[in-house]
């Protein structure tokens, strides 16, 4: 397993991963309409390039030179980093890939003076249990209006 910072050249791979991961992850949690909208709004190549330019660092996990997982994070306030996204192919889940990505990002955030790593996770997403196992705790429960959808999330935090 190789974990590295992604570049603009990796945007297509991240878009393809999102398409493969979002449907099985969210099909029983949110509507197909919302999945399609979110993929287009947040994971199109254009959107990912804008995120990269705005300061989001993307991380890619590769196995045998194939992208199997990705994450994105950035500084959102002094000493607080936001894990905007972390997705692992279903075939790779349970193999330590997500944990390795969290450790990689934790190290990068610490090196840059981070004290807290924060994330949002849908309250119906079983990933919240994974995040608890790697040291996150529920900080708040929120309902966020996003275009014509409501995001029912936990905000989780981990001290670095």
Question: Residue ranges of each PLM-predicted region?
Answer:
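Short glycine-rich hinge loops at helix-strand junctions in the catalytic core
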Residues: 96, 135
């Amino acid at each position: 397993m190789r974990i590295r910072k992604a570049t603009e050249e990796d945007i297509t791979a991240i878009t393809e991963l999102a398409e493969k991961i979002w449907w099985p992850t969210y099909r029983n949690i949110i509507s197909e309409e919302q999945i399609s909208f979110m993929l287009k709004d947040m994971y199109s190549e254009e959107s990912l390039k804008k995120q990269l330019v705005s300061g989001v660092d993307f991380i890619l996990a590769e196995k045998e030179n194939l992208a199997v997982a990705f994450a994105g994070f950035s500084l959102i306030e002094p000493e607080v980093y936001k894990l905007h996204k972390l997705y692992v192919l279903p075939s790779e889940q349970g193999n330590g890939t997500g944990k390795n990505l969290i450790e990689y990002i934790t190290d990068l955030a610490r090196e840059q003076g981070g004290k807290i790593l924060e994330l949002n996770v849908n309250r119906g997403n079983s990933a919240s249990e994974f995040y608890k196992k790697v040291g996150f705790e529920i900080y708040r429960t929120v309902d966020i209006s996003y275009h014509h959808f409501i995001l029912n999330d936990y905000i989780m935090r981990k001290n670095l």
